[in-house]
Curated annotation (Swiss-Prot):
Residues bearing PTM Phosphoserine: S203
A GO cellular component annotation in the UniProt record: membrane
Disulfide bonds: none
InterPro entries, alphabetized: Acyl-CoA_DS, FA_desaturase_dom, FADS-1_CS
UniProt remark on domains: The histidine box domains are involved in binding the catalytic metal ions.
Motif segment (Histidine box-1): 120-125
Gene responsible for this protein: SCD
Species per Swiss-Prot/TrEMBL record: Sus scrofa
GO molecular function: iron ion binding; oxidoreductase activity; stearoyl-CoA 9-desaturase activity
Protein's name according to its UniProt entry: Stearoyl-CoA desaturase
């Protein structure tokens, strides 16, 4: 489809928005660790059917020391072995056939989109709707990524938004870079994560047969899609050596996808600008967006979690938005939620850090 026609298709499907002016409060954490209250406004009610990913300013951490960390040694050992295998895969890259490298890159893109367009923007935030063929594709691609099943991923992510930067946030960035990057997967969840996560309304995903099917058969699914298939195809189809197939196409590719996603939780909460809301931790981080196919515009995303682009700028360093728009042009995605420019500019004027550049 010509670019101008695709652009018309994109514009024609945006959801009409309604402005509301009810303010609430938000906690501001500044560089010195001081906490203060600052107004937060919800500009548009463009996704009235779900509110469990909207920040809850009333929740506060309980006073007193955190519970002692309980290490999950199985995860520590498996993650260590995976990354050792990935390092060996880097050494093997010069000995790989070009088809193997292309295969690994394609598998990385597919699995990344399964997380970003699937688990994140579709199932966690309901920022757009997808017809059955697209949902099937996204469930398969998400299984290729092996980052917990969609139900668990979405539950943790909704808790991350609703209770951001508190003990009920599964990967609370106030606990440091390592914890928010991978450490949270190596220890037992904080009791507040279990308590508050268990209270979230997950009825939409419980009613989604594909999501429940994936959850039921997740272990054999990830064994096949994340490990066996990416290893067997290069070895069988074009005669790649088995070590290159295993360590490059599987271990290295999987480790890259994992770390690209983790950087959204760590680097994009610590490094970058906050043009939309300086009162929250998430930042705009272009490097993260490159690796995570469009998920690095994190200050925007936490300010407007109901926007299907997770960014103001649609396709700018945002392969996921491009993918969703292409699916919309094919009739497979629809009802894409998009925040109006007026609402964005109004929010920037109220809470931005003055780093905003229109474009």
């Amino acid at each position: 489809m010509p670019a101008h026609l695709l652009q018309e298709e994109i514009s024609s499907s945006y959801t009409t928005t309604t402005t509301i002016t009810a303010p609430s409060s938000r906690v501001l954490q500044n560089g010195g660790g001081k906490l203060e209250k600052t107004p937060q406004y919800v500009e548009e009610d463009i996704r009235p059917e779900m509110k469990d990913d909207i920040y809850d300013p009333t929740y506060q951490d309980k006073e007193g020391p955190r519970p002692k960390l309980e290490y999950v040694w199985r995860n520590i050992i498996l993650m260590s072995l995976l990354h050792l295998g990935a390092l060996y895969g880097i050494i093997l890259i010069p000995t790989c056939k070009i088809y193997t490298l292309l295969w690994a890159f394609a598998y990385y893109l597919l699995s990344a989109v399964g997380v970003t367009a699937g688990a994140h923007r579709l199932w966690s935030h309901r920022t757009y709707k997808a017809r059955l063929p697209l949902r099937v594709f996204l469930i398969i691609a998400n299984t290729m990524a092996f980052q917990n099943d969609v139900y668990e991923w979405a539950r943790d992510h909704r808790a991350h938004h609703k209770f951001s930067e508190t003990d009920a946030d599964p990967h609370n960035s106030r606990r440091g870079f390592f914890f928010s990057h991978v450490g949270w997967l190596l220890v037992r969840k904080h009791p507040a994560v279990k308590e508050k996560g268990g209270l979230l309304n997950m009825s939409d995903l419980k009613a989604e047969k594909l999501v429940m099917f994936q959850r039921r058969y997740y272990k054999p699914g990830i064994l096949l899609m994340c490990f066996i298939l990416p290893t067997i195809v290069p070895w069988y189809c074009w005669g790649e050596a088995f070590p290159q197939s295993l360590f490059v196409a599987t271990f290295l590719r999987y480790a890259i996808v994992l770390n690209a996603t983790w950087l959204v939780n760590s680097a994009a909460h610590l490094y970058g600008y906050r043009p939309y809301d300086k009162t929250i931790s998430p930042r705009e981080n272009i490097l993260v967006s490159l690796g995570a196919v469009g998920e690095g515009f994190h200050n925007y995303h936490h300010t407007f979690p109901y926007d299907y682009s997770a960014s103001e700028y649609r396709w700018h360093i945002n392969l996921t938005t491009f993918f969703i728009d292409c699916m919309a042009a094919l009739g497979l995605a629809y009802d894409r939620k998009k925040v109006s420019k007026a609402a964005i500019l109004a929010r920037i004027k109220r809470t931005g850090d003055e780093s905003y550049k229109s474009g």
